[in-house]
Amino acid sequence: MQETVAYKRYLAVYDRTVEFSSPTTTPANAEEKISIKYDIVGHPRSGFRFVAVLPFHSETREFTVCREYIQSVNASGVTVPTGGHEPEKHGEDIANAAKAEMNEEAKLVGGRLVNLMEKKSENEGDREVGEEEGFIETKWCRNKFVPFLCVDPKDVEEGQEGKLDVEEFALETFRVDLKELKRMMYSGEMMLPSIITCQMSLDYLVKSGLISKDEYHGSS
């Protein structure tokens, strides 16, 4: 495999060439190879890792979500607090990135943070030291994301709010009930990493008894 950087700004585009055995290999041409070029996209500044975190407020039975500008379709869309894991800013623990994004985008701190990927990987023993678990964002993207749930965070104190990135100028934060969250998840307006984070969070909340099965199914 060979790879070079074709373009780099906020994201990087990699020109990757991969060599495969020919699909028409026979004993007579066993050494025949084919080379295929791919465009690969990723965010090297964050080590190709990001987080998505869904805040749940048990007293009001609500969830905090965001509405922000989605540049690819030039329209607004719904997300949960989401952002890159930058080791120089957050340290090696990816949970710190989830806490920071929740502070910056939702103005929430504290609560019980749950890494929804822990013990999910069947290949955990195959990982190299420092390699993070996570879902691959898309087949042509190097980024992986780790979903988190935060139960009962509190409003951040005045003056302690994290600073939004300049491109997040239009971000709005609001709360929704379970019925509205599920509607947004399957309406086409929510980003896929956020949908996965919401579904895994709801599964966790039901299994842990924080949301009853009747409450979950009654919201459909």
Language-model segments: what does each one mean?
Residues 41-54, 59-100, 104, 108, ...:
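Conserved Nudix-box catalytic region and its N-terminal flanking loop in Nudix hydrolases
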Residues 62-63, 111-113, 144-150:
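Conserved active-site beta-strand-loop modules that form the wall/rim of enzyme catalytic pockets
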